Design a protein with these regions (language model features):
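GD-rich hexapeptide-repeat beta-solenoids
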Residues: 26, 95-101
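Residue-level markers of secondary-structure register and packing in elongated scaffolds
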Residues: 1-15, 27-33, 37-40, 45-85, ...
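Short, solvent-exposed aromatic-acidic interface loops
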Residues: 241-245
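Alpha-helical "lid/cap" subdomains adjacent to substrate-binding clefts that gate access
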Residues: 233-239
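Extracellular, surface-exposed repeat architectures
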Residues: 104-110
């Protein structure tokens, strides 16, 4: 897979074309301040155009796709987003309004008669998100932290739970989770389905504000442990191994260039293609033979 880039005289990316396992191309235009104002994405013979507009402070005020999907934004004097209006490809608008406390922390997000309330501890870390909804009633996400303000536990509105451990240097050692990770956030449930965006995953009645005792007995805890490359300026996760409470285990190894470029399992390789904004535009998975994980791991100092 090969990607060719083209730049203007000041280093702005103008064109990007990937060939081989992926056939995808991008072109970009910019305003005088260097902000992207236009993107053209061509993939599989289909072209999607996106345009971006900004205010005098460089804050994004609108995003419009040729599909008809649109987002508009408004801000207060402190630069906090106070309104986000999403217009689906069917022309239906959804307006989300946000408010903040004196510390510029988000305190509420409102969609009509539904809202999410956010609370924080004395260190400024979010401890709860509570959705009050006509469709779902009251749903709560809760967060807990250690003395260093590192997230140690997340308990979701549907019983999904995560626990985290760290080493003495603050690097995450492991993540344990139970429940179905294929779920929507409270913010997604607040806005609801919008034409042009992926459909939300609605919780069942039995999932609403469930706790661990309510979880189906067949669900297992799974723990992921991380291996780091310490030779880089910013430590990179070079592999992660996930083991279920039943003993099943799988490892994924990662390769990097300027970004993460590939992931390897025992029988597959996933290659990543990025757009000009640094977001993953494509993930291409193909089967491989042999010790894919072992061959992907670099010979470096690592920490578990």
């Amino acid at each position: 897979m090969t990607t060719v880039y083209g730049y203007d005289s000041v280093g702005n990316l103008l064109t990007q074309a990937t060939s081989g396992a992926s056939e995808i191309a991008f072109s970009y235009s910019y305003n005088k301040n260097g902000y992207i104002t236009g993107e053209v994405r061509t993939e599989g013979g289909k072209t999607t155009e996106s345009t971006y507009a900004y205010d005098a402070l460089g804050q994004l005020t609108s995003f419009l796709q040729s599909t008809g999907y649109e987002e508009q934004y408004a801000y207060d004097k402190a630069g906090n987003m106070t309104e986000k209006v999403l217009t689906g490809t069917d022309g239906i608008e959804t307006a989300l309004k946000m408010s903040y406390n004196k510390g510029n922390q988000l305190t509420t997000m409102v969609n009509g008669k539904d809202k999410i309330a956010y609370t924080y501890d004395k260190n400024g870390s979010m401890v709860t998100k509570v959705l009050t909804s006509q469709a779902y009633g009251k749903l709560t996400d809760a967060y807990a932290y250690n003395a260093l303000d590192q997230l140690t536990e997340y308990v979701g509105y549907d019983g999904y739970k995560q626990e985290f451990t760290y080493d003495a240097n603050g690097m995450r050692l492991s993540k344990s989770e139970v429940g179905n990770g294929n779920r929507s956030t409270l913010e997604e449930l607040l806005r609801g389905n919008i034409a042009g965006l992926p459909e939300i995953v609605e919780p069942t009645q039995g999932q609403i504000n469930a706790d661990e005792a309510d979880m189906p007995t067949e669900l297992e805890w799974a723990t992921t442990e991380y291996l780091y490359d310490l030779t880089q300026e910013y430590y990179q996760v070079i592999s992660e191994t996930t083991t279920s409470s039943g003993g099943a285990s799988s490892t994924t190894a990662y390769a990097y260039g300027l970004e993460r470029i590939a992931a390897f399992t025992s029988d597959s390789r996933t290659s990543y293609v990025y757009d000009g904004r640094g977001s993953v535009a494509q993930a291409i998975t193909a089967p491989v033979t042999g010790e894919a994980v072992s061959s992907a791991l670099p010979d470096v100092s690592v920490q578990v």
